[in-house]
Amino acid sequence: MKTPNITVVGSINMDMVTITDVVPVQGETVLGKDFRTVPGGKGANQAVAAARLGANVRMIGRVGDDPFGHVLTENLAKEGIITDSVKPVTDCTSGVATILLSDRDNRIIVTKGANEHVTPDYVAAFEQELAASDVVLLQLEIPLETVAYVLEFCAKHHVTTVLNPAPAQKLPDAAWTDATYISPNENECLQLFGDEPDANLRQKLIMTKGADGVQFYENDEQVQVESFRVEPVDTTGAGDTFNGAFAVALGGGTVKEAVRFANAAAALSVQSFGAQGGMPTKAQVQSFLQEQGG
């Protein structure tokens, strides 16, 4: 299998993580156990996941002209990701995610900052790179008109797209049509498409269900791929790891095989702290799959 060329158009954030035993209710103050800042953002996370798994990855995004922005760009470059399409925005803060981590679960508030400047005009400067991609990954932490523009462009140029519709937001009908694959989690799928997505949409859906695995449709027949049982430390980046790994594996076999590979990568990712901290290499995923019976 040739090394895939993957372009990620999406968010780049600094994750500000507070670890606590108790989640405060309204008006309550509780003591936290620890505080950490770690690189994140759904776009950047998926880019790192794909790069760790051996893909050639380009990130298209924006950061603030601030200390966080410099750290975030350097972090991507350190992972081998092409960053000449990540440019700072003057007089704007970098995107930030405030994460409350408790009992190995998480709650997240995202402040978009420079991610709001990932506009169609900005991305249009990289159309040549988009057209040369094997897979383009998108999420919904950047302006929705940009997502719709990229999906339309890629559909016209026969480039495979994976749209991770998180956080769940409505897009024009044409955007869903233009996407090759749509990868919501169970809650996002229900919010966006209801209990019974139409037949055309079902063929695109790769629905993640946490510990219950992944569900998709093949020739209108429901297929369920079980998850791998592990003891999680931090689930923050599991979905992003899944999406990056799914994009990497798409060119090497069936959708079911790509989902199983992505499930294995996600299982490994939750065993370390931080969205990117536990993202595995291709060798680690292959070794894990062998241990699990191939």
Swiss-Prot record:
Q: What class of enzyme is it?
A: transferase
How many cofactors are bound and how?
Answer: Requires a divalent cation, most likely magnesium in vivo, as an electrophilic catalyst to aid phosphoryl group transfer. It is the chelate of the metal and the nucleotide that is the actual substrate.
* Cross-referenced SUPFAM superfamilies: Ribokinase-like
The residues the record assigns to binding substrate are 13-15, 41-45, 141, 240
Q: What GO MF terms are annotated?
A: ATP binding; metal ion binding; ribokinase activity
Positions binding K(+) in this chain are 234, 236, 269, 272, 274
Q: What is its EC number?
A: 2.7.1.15
What is the regulatory mechanism acting on its activity?
Answer: Activated by a monovalent cation that binds near, but not in, the active site. The most likely occupant of the site in vivo is potassium. Ion binding induces a conformational change that may alter substrate affinity.
- Report the leader peptide range: none
Note the PANTHER family from the entry: RIBOKINASE, SUGAR KINASE
Q: Which family does it belong to?
A: Belongs to the carbohydrate kinase PfkB family. Ribokinase subfamily.
Q: What is this protein called?
A: Ribokinase
Its source organism is: Halalkalibacterium halodurans (strain ATCC BAA-125 / DSM 18197 / FERM 7344 / JCM 9153 / C-125)
Lineage runs:
Bacteria, Bacillati, Bacillota, Bacilli, Bacillales
Gene coding for it = rbsK
